């Protein structure tokens, strides 16, 4: 099942200046029936991508914000379970929400690197379509000179699948609150249904600035600066890896 949406708007506020705004939202889902396994369990999974904006959230400052946001998000996640009567599931009544769990790390990552308020960021790895932010392409032409600028940024969940042992804590079919059993210790771990190994934000200015000109002798001249950045949150290793690249052409 695919739920993909693309939107684009082009405006020309002044002659020669074209501004293109575009947004994408891709929610691809799959369902697998394991008919060769006892009980024929169903595995759900898929991939996800949406346009966003991550400008100004760079380096150490953004990472420190990510670390701080974990505590705020963990408190909010715990609050979702706190109002439920879970003594028959968890011996202590409420589960312990760890700051390095996927349910905490992913919203903290999104809020830190897209500049969102951690008190209002959705507690999900799949942000709502209403949180889409546009990317843009700007072109300005005057006489024989053309200036170009383009910004593309996407938040992505490359691939995920459901936990086979996941069980819900409520009868509400719209709720993702539940738990799995740790295969090593046997302890119950509060979690949403999906095992998400990694999420990322890919950002590029392609170009940051480009100047194209046709000289009087019909020779084309072009100067271009590209900037790209990749942010990857690996859940298993609890690492955020940031890489960047600058190209001058």
Give names to the regions the model predicted.
Residues 1-249:
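Exposed, low-structure sequence patches enriched in small/polar residues
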